[in-house]
């Protein structure tokens, strides 16, 4: 296929850009280092888009760096957020800084789409481990998975009348913010 060199060039360039801008010991800003938007803050919902591909390209160490940040730096503030809001487990902030404290935002405290990311990130890295490495990995990161899941379970309420779980008080951002 005559397009193979172009595809290869694009893949190599993309990997270079992602490695140089996104693979670090802290989550990257929403737009990386090229452009500064959203106050240059880390946006945890972007971790999936910016970093999960490293597992597919056989570079899981970059995801482990992020898991270390979740465990060693962000875990305690995330637990405080969940407790302050009346939930179990850990609630990962939407927009943050290197110390993992919530950054000022008129909507960030209400968003939860970043919640499942540490669980999936841990699974992606775990799948790359040998059996001996996997046991240590589970020991090191199982609390992130368990406490994230606890928050997610405590965030919903069971509606017995309709036999379903609901997220109370949730509303779409475009329906609640002034235009």
What residue spans do the PLM features occupy?
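Short, glycine/acidic-rich hinge or "gate" loops at secondary-structure transitions
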Residues: 25-33, 137-140, 157-167
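Acidic/polar, glycine-enriched structural segments that form the non-catalytic walls/loops
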Residues: 1-41, 60, 70-79
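Aromatic-rich carbohydrate-recognition surfaces in CAZymes
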Residues: 38-157
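Acidic/histidine-rich catalytic neighborhood
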Residues: 147, 151-179
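Acidic/His metal-coordination segments adjacent to aromatic residues that form catalytic metal sites
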Residues: 26-40, 92-108, 167-179
């Amino acid at each position: 296929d005559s397009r193979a060199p172009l595809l290869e060039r694009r893949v190599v360039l993309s990997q270079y850009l992602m490695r140089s801008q996104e693979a670090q010991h802290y989550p990257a800003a929403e737009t990386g280092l090229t452009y500064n938007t959203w106050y240059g803050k880390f946006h945890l919902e972007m971790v999936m888009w910016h970093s999960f591909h490293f597992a597919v390209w056989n570079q899981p160490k970059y995801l482990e760096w992020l898991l270390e940040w979740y465990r060693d730096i962000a875990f305690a503030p995330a637990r405080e957020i969940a407790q302050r809001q009346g939930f179990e487990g850990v609630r990962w902030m939407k927009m943050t800084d290197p110390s993992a404290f919530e950054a000022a935002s008129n909507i960030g405290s209400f968003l939860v789409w970043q919640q499942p990311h540490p669980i999936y990130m841990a699974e992606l890295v775990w799948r790359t481990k040998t059996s001996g490495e996997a046991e240590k990995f589970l020991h090191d990161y199982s609390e992130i998975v368990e406490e994230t899941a606890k928050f997610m379970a405590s965030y919903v309420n069971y509606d017995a009348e309709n036999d379903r779980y609901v997220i109370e008080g949730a509303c779409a951002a475009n329906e609640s913010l002034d235009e």
